[in-house]
UniProtKB/Swiss-Prot annotation:
Transaldolase is important for the balance of metabolites in the pentose-phosphate pathway. The active site is at K83. It is an enzyme of class 2 (transferase). Pathway: Carbohydrate degradation; pentose phosphate pathway; D-glyceraldehyde 3-phosphate and beta-D-fructose 6-phosphate from D-ribose 5-phosphate and D-xylulose 5-phosphate (non-oxidative stage): step 2/3. Gene3D superfamilies: Aldolase class I (3.20.20.70). It comes from Clostridium botulinum (strain Eklund 17B / Type B). This is Probable transaldolase. Keywords: Cytoplasm, Pentose shunt, Schiff base, Transferase.
Length: 214
């Protein structure tokens, strides 16, 4: 399973990239707004840091507007992937963009049939949201398993990006469920690095080494 970082914060992206574990970035209007900077300016800087898929989202809710925005975003860099919301107008836009060779990531997926429709419309990626399903008492991992099974049975090449990932357990379960990618907040990536026994082991090694050199 590949790992993307889910942020628009340049420092977080730089730090995550230095770890050598990420191969893509996802952003959304909320994450961009937090940075208080121009959308294109932020995206251009991200593309200079990470050599991999960079998702930028449209804000229009009608097909014509989505397609227009998508074409402009796609011009920023060859690695751009256009995030399109799951809705009828979004599917129309995805189909048009697919025919033009523009990659898309259909977001806000909450059911396997939504993912199937997005894939058949020509989506390069689908993004099921785990945490938000957990919030309403559903099991996000069942959704990942269902999408993965459907895509495998029917030979669908659309990749699954598990989104709304909130903790290391989510990441573990995504990998086991067959997700192609997990897009993870920077703070969760840092949580994944740590384990109490690892920290204790490092501390013991250092103490033993110091004892040898006294």
């Amino acid at each position: 399973m590949k790992i993307f970082v889910d942020t628009a914060n340049i420092e977080e992206i730089k730090k995550a990239n230095e770890l050598g574990v990420i191969c893509g970035v996802t952003t959304n209007p909320s994450l961009i707004a937090k940075e208080g900077r121009d959308f294109k300016e932020v995206i251009k800087e991200i593309t200079s840091i990470v050599d991999g898929p960079i998702s930028g989202e449209v804000i229009s809710m009608e097909c014509e507007g989505m397609v227009k925005e998508a074409r402009e975003i796609a011009k920023i860099h060859e690695n751009m992937v256009i995030k399109i919301p799951m809705c009828a107008e979004g599917l129309k836009a995805v189909n048009i963009l697919h025919k033009e060779g523009i990659k898309t990531n259909v977001t806000l997926i909450f059911s396997a049939v939504q993912a199937l429709l997005a894939a058949r419309a020509g989506a390069s990626y689908v993004s099921p949201f785990l945490g938000r399903l957990d919030d309403i008492g559903s099991t996000g991992m069942t959704l990942i398993e269902d999408i993965s099974e459907i895509f495998a049975v029917h030979g669908i090449e659309t990749e699954i990006i598990s989104a709304s990932v909130r903790n290391p357990i989510h990441v573990l379960e995504c990998a086991k469920a067959g997700s192609d990618i997990a897009t993870i907040p920077y703070n969760v990536i840092m949580q994944m690095i740590k384990h109490p026994l690892t920290d204790a082991g490092i501390e013991k090694f250092l103490k033993d080494y110091e004892g040898m050199n006294k």
